[in-house]
Swiss-Prot record:
Pathway: Alkaloid biosynthesis. The keyword Transport does not apply. This is Protopine 6-monooxygenase. The lineage of its organism: Eukaryota, Viridiplantae, Streptophyta, Embryophyta, Tracheophyta. The gene is CYP82N2v2. The chain crosses the membrane at residues 4-24, 232-252, 319-339. It comes from Eschscholzia californica (California poppy). Coiled coil: none annotated. Catalyzes the conversion of protopine and allocryptopine to dihydrosanguinarine and dihydrochelerythrine, respectively, in the biosynthesis of isoquinoline alkaloid sanguinarine.
Length: 524
């Protein structure tokens, strides 16, 4: 009887246990899921397929629109850019979490169709995925071009090019007739001096300036091709966000234009590479430019699976693009702000006169002692960062500010809002360089202080910070020390930002009247 009962009850007991375990796991997993998965709020107004992309067609500056959305949704919220989910953040604490605790996860920079087509796809150090290849190229770039030792070695080259451009500037602003004042297009001049220095350091060439006669046709062609490259690179492509709409890019002709430009860029770089290869064994080490260095070491590097010539061309192109437009834009903003804050300009000139006097030009060795000048540069980069939005992509699931973030999610840091946070900065909309001499004196722009990130942060921070700062300080000091600057009728400068491009350009020209204030022999 007991055996029969046991035989009867056993299957029921087993079935009951299985059912209980199943139901327990079902409900507990749902409970745990609901408890664990907490995502950042999603902004309303997304369209099918396009997501929130339609919001960026209003003409409003993206960083200002996203800043207003952050005021509504919080310092971390999500948006849909076509097929891509994007986490938008604008808080110092959250940004620090992204680039310290989760820095490895956010070490990839999303690429675009434009950069894939025109900058050698994944060979470029700017967009190649984080890994052994990126680390090797980054090391080469940092040690062979951007290290303190290398910057010291190329100091004379930089100074030589700056001298040439300032001689050109002096010739331009002479007014022997004494008639109507001569207006100098400072945006154009800043572009010339930036390009000359960068081109000389990277590939040993000088490509801009009114005094160039030899190779002028080549210089004009190069500038035309590079201007087109930068214009096309700034375009938003439907295929980057919604592949189903990729036919629109073809219809608009953007893809074919990019492919044509890529061939022109490659032809220029290939020509330079062949010239460097021919003179490889005849250039003294002290006279080598960056392309020379790349040629001498790329074969010994751990770059298996990558075409050596493509690596050299891609790396040099990335350095040129990263060092020309950006420094010129920063210098334009600095002078624009000083023209609207003449007291700061006066204070900067007094610092220069006290340190340098009026019997010689500013030299590299003076720069470290120009404390107020350094504060001016920091304050300008705080108010008008080169990149108002910093983009990354996480490789796998992680947690940010208590929110679950799925692998593949893109990160968009609103640097502009971050650097105008009233909880961090006193009077954030006011141009006040003195803040970096007092309450914010310990903050620098190298990416270690997350309140101020004009050059980015984490593993992908701009490697050329020291190069850019040394160059900008030298040009700025020479300009303010050597010239009285004024606008026509002493009007204020328009500080409107341009909505176009990846770099935060000033929308209108910067035309100034320059009057030499030192002995004429110092300009020769």
């Amino acid at each position: 009887m007991d055996s029969l009962m046991l035989a009867y009850l056993f299957p029921i007991s087993v079935a009951s246990i299985i059912a209980f375990v199943f139901l327990y796991n079902l409900f507990s997993s749902r409970t745990l899921k609901n408890k664990k998965i907490r995502t950042a709020p999603m902004a309303t107004g997304a369209w099918p397929v396009l997501g929130h992309l339609h919001l960026f067609g209003s003409g409003e500056l993206p960083h200002k629109m996203l800043a207003a959305m952050a005021d509504k949704y919080g310092s971390a919220f999500r948006m849909k850019f076509g097929k891509h989910t994007t986490l938008v953040v604008s808080d110092t604490r959250i940004v620090k979490e992204c680039f310290t605790t989760n820095d490895t996860l956010f070490s990839n920079r999303p690429s675009t169709k434009a950069f894939q087509l025109m900058t050698y796809d994944n060979e470029s150090v700017a967009f190649t995925p984080y890994g052994s290849y990126w680390r090797e190229i980054r090391k080469i770039s940092t040690l062979k071009l951007l290290s303190n030792h290398r910057l010291q070695a190329i100091k004379d080259v930089r100074a030589s090019e700056v001298n040439v451009c300032f001689k050109t500037l002096y010739d331009q602003c002479k007014n022997p007739s004494g008639s109507a004042p001569i207006l100098i297009d400072m945006k154009k001049w800043f572009e010339e001096v930036s390009n000359n220095v960068v081109m000389r350091v990277i590939v040993g060439r000088q490509n801009f300036g009114s005094k160039i006669v030899q190779g002028e046709e080549e210089a004009i062609h190069y500038k035309k091709v590079m201007d087109e490259l930068l214009r096309l690179a700034s375009l938003s492509m439907f295929s980057d966000f919604a592949p189903l709409l990729g036919f629109v890019d073809i219809f608009q002709g953007n893809l074919s234009a990019m492919k044509r430009n890529a061939k022109k860029v490659d032809a220029i770089l290939e020509n330079w590479l062949e010239e460097h290869r021919k003179k490889k064994n005849s250039v003294a080490e002290s006279q080598q430019d960056f392309m020379d260095v790349m040629l001498s070491i790329v074969e010994e590097s751990k770059l298996s699976g990558h075409d050596a010539d493509a690596v050299i061309k891609a790396t040099c192109l990335a350095m040129i693009m990263g060092g020309t437009d950006t420094t010129a834009v920063s210098l334009t903003w600095i002078i624009s702000l000083l023209m609207n804050n003449r007291h700061a300009l006066k204070k900067a000139r007094e610092e220069l006169d006290a340190l340098v006097g009026k019997d010689r030009q500013v030299e590299d060795s003076d720069l470290k002692n120009l404390v107020y000048m350094n504060a001016i540069v920091k304050e300008t980069m705080r108010m008008y960062p080169l990149g108002t939005l910093l983009e990354r992509e996480t490789k796998e699931d992680c947690e940010i500010d208590g929110f679950h973030v799925k692998g593949g999610t893109r990160l968009l840091v609103n640097v502009w809002k971050l650097q105008r946070d009233p909880n961090v900065w006193v009077d954030p909309t006011e141009f006040r360089p003195e803040r970096f001499l007092t309450e914010n004196a310990d903050i620098d722009v190298g990416g270690q202080h997350f309140e101020l990130l004009p050059f980015g942060a984490g593993r992908r921070v701009c490697p050329g910070v020291x190069f850019a700062l040394q160059f900008m300080h030298l040009v700025l000091a020479r300009l303010i020390h050597g010239y009285d600057l004024n606008t026509l009728n002493e009007e204020n400068v328009d500080l409107t930002e341009s909505p176009e491009g990846h770099v935060n350009h000033k929308a209108s020209p910067l035309d100034l009247i320059l009057t030499p204030r030192l002995h004429y022999k110092l300009y020769e």
